[in-house]
Amino acid sequence: MTRSRSRALRVASALAAVALVAAGCDGSGFVPGTDGGAGDDETAAAAAPDAVVTANVKDEAADVSVDKVVRVRAEKGTLTSVVLRSKAGRVEGEIRGDGARWVSSAGLEPGTRYRVRAVARNAEGKEVQRVSTFTTQALSLEQQTYASIAPLQGETVGVGMPVVVNFDLPVTDQASFEKHMTVTSTPAQAGSWFWVSSREAHWRPQSYWQAGTKVSVDVAVNGVSAGAGIYGQEDRKVDFEIGAAHVYKVNARTHQMKVFENGRLLRTLPITTGKEGFTTRSGVKVIMEKYAQKRMNSETVGIARGSAEAYDIDDVKWAMRITSSGEFIHAAPWSVGSQGRANVSHGCTGMSIDNAAWLYSMTRRGDVVEYVGTDRAMEPGNGWGDWNVSWPDYVAGSALA
């Protein structure tokens, strides 16, 4: 091979190599040494979209109702944290639906600024945050009803004690309130709410409480609509305990009271009850109040001053109220000669000073006094007359029945 021939071959080989490289860049996408598949950019999955967080209260909203249930929702992701708070503290709530939504579970305070901070995470773990604020409506005290509860916190009461909730303003939407009113006990005992009026609700078990029962009352009505533009003012909670089972059985015909504790007869006491025209009521009564000494004036029970039946005694000893209308159990030393023999009182149950002092010393609010032997019935609304209502009728007195 001549020198010129050899150079020509080298040039031809170089041109061929350039042509092969150029072929690797043409529209076919074929690259020597590959199988002709798609490139890395085409096989990579598309990036997951960001989570989207929304709330049912607009940012900077004003005059939000205090009974508003705040809801936060996450789309294209899950909620990891939601905090609803004011300067006074956090509002309780919970994440539901596998992280899809958060719902508040407590009421809002009137005239208060709240901040909502929600964090959600998408499928790739990327977090987004939404922060918003709102202000609730202002309410006067005339637009808020406050609940008072009996028994008192920590009190030990008798087996007949109903839970008594009094509201200082009427509750017309009783069903809404009752949904937020609970009574739990250990051991558990079935019971029901009974609305005495728009201002008063009672709860009692089907039968007398078991001695030693521990009871918790939760009236969680803060921010709940009571109807007619009125809302619950605040939540109330009370814990109390049931003491020994005291049941006092009074027979107006035999003029005796049998005193039982936990089913065991302790004493039989001679007593007197209401005479003709002032008949003591028959039925189940509950000790409502206790006074070591109390003034009793006949005008408070409708007996006019100056009449033949009028009385005004400053120092009646060991008085225990059993009706709103004015029936008491108390010491009546002026009628000892009739006790155990005749009914001579104006409706109260009288006994000797010693017997009254003994009974007073063992008695608690809520102890039961069962009366028989007269033709005058105890009215359910005359004090804590809950046990004079049949169980079916009591259950029917619930706003949720």
Regions found by a protein language model. Name each.
Residues T2-A244, I271:
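Acidic, low-complexity Ser/Thr/Gly/Pro-rich repeat segments typical of extracellular/periplasmic
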